[in-house]
């Protein structure tokens, strides 16, 4: 996988400008893991939460394409 030579990595030709770090952007962000603990004695009358709502990885980017925004920003990225 190419990280677009330091470009933002948006679009098919990776020409959104430089200084964005390309795919290396995700390496500088701290990786955090959030764990939710449910009370086993919860007496709620609603439907049980089945864990089907998982956050997307890599900055919650859920798309396969990148769109160049202002200042070389990507409004929708999936840079694994």
From Swiss-Prot:
InterPro entries, A to Z:
Metalthion_15p
What triggers its expression?
A: By heavy metals.
Q: Name one Pfam family in it.
A: Metallothio_2
- Keywords from the UniProt entry: Metal-binding, Metal-thiolate cluster
Q: Which one of the record's GO molecular function terms can you name? A: metal ion binding
What job does the chain carry out? Answer: Metallothioneins have a high content of cysteine residues that bind various heavy metals.
Its recorded name reads: Metallothionein-like protein 2B
Q: Which organism is it from?
A: Oryza sativa subsp. japonica
């Amino acid at each position: 996988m190419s990280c677009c030579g330091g470009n933002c990595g948006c679009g098919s030709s990776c020409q959104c400008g430089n200084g964005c770090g390309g795919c290396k952007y995700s390496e500088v962000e701290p990786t955090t893991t959030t764990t939710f603990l449910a009370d086993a004695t919860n007496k709620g009358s609603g439907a049980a939460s089945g864990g089907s709502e998982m956050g997307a990885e890599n900055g919650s980017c859920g798309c396969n394409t990148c769109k160049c925004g202002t200042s070389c920003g990507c409004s929708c990225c999936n840079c694994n």
